[in-house]
């Protein structure tokens, strides 16, 4: 597992979150980081930290999920397959042990980066955005905390969906490496899969993700074995 690629993934997630639109000023959409560092207090008063987190989670972040999943598989290409270093690992641990370890590396890199990136963003908005709305003298009391709690619970459920979705894309991307070591193909194909299936899969039950993960893993595992069946394990 390459720590540099994981760090790159985390930076991508955090940057996408901070650059997401959160309000308007003079008819122009402003991002989260602009609201914080340019002092748009009129926007911040009407946006709680739970709002800021949920807006990003329900926004266009899912469009970048294939990139996060694809980058997780790049160390396999760059560090091993294209330099033939994988023969060393085959002789040391065997092909049948090497393949599951690479799948596990991709899943941890993709899912872990998304989770850590969102955690860092959550800490950021918790520090710089209020916990309750500020409507001045007309502020409504009594429902804010309950609304925030429901919003957080809903966001947590959706976050679980996103993590499962990234796990599925990571498994798919790792299996794709067994077919081609072309970096551009491995980056682009998950985007095509995401474009075709995102609106369907993001509204399904979690067990569908698990079934697809098993399907993609079994298919990719067989492809890896076929590719290196002549290699002594």
Q: Language-model segments: what does each one mean?
A:
Residues 211-233:
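Junction motif at the cytosolic side of a transmembrane helix
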Residues 21-23, 199-202:
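Juxtamembrane "helix-exit" motif on the non-cytosolic side of transmembrane helices
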Residues 94-96, 100, 182-186, 206:
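Membrane-helix interface segments
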Residues 7-12, 182-197, 212:
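Central hydrophobic cores of alpha-helical transmembrane segments
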Residues 76-109:
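Helix-loop-helix units of permease transmembrane domains in multi-pass membrane transporters
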Residues 1-2:
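N-terminal Sec/SRP start-transfer signal
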């Amino acid at each position: 597992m390459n720590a540099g690629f994981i760090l790159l993934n985390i930076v991508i997630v955090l940057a996408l979150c901070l650059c997401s639109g959160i309000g308007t000023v003079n008819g122009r959409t402003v991002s989260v980081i602009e609201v914080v560092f340019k002092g748009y207090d009129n926007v911040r008063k009407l946006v709680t930290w739970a709002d800021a987190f949920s807006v990003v989670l329900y926004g266009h972040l899912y469009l970048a999920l294939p990139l996060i999943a694809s980058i997780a598989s790049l160390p396999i290409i760059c560090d091993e397959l294209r330099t033939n270093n994988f023969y060393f690992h085959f002789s040391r641990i065997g092909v049948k042990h090497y393949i599951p370890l690479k799948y596990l590396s991709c899943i941890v890199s993709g899912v872990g980066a998304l989770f850590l990136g969102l955690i860092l963003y959550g800490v950021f908005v918790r520090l710089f955005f209020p916990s309750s709305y500020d409507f001045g003298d007309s502020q409504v009391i009594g429902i804010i905390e309950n609304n925030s709690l429901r919003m957080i619970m809903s966001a947590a459920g959706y976050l679980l969906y996103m993590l499962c979705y990234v796990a599925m894309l990571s498994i798919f991307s790792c299996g794709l490496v067994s077919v081609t070591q072309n970096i551009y193909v491995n980056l682009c194909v998950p985007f095509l899969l995401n474009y075709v299936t995102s609106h369907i899969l993001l509204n399904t039950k979690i067990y569908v993700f698990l079934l697809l993960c098993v399907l993609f893993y079994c298919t990719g595992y067989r492809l890896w074995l076929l590719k290196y069946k002549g290699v002594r394990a």
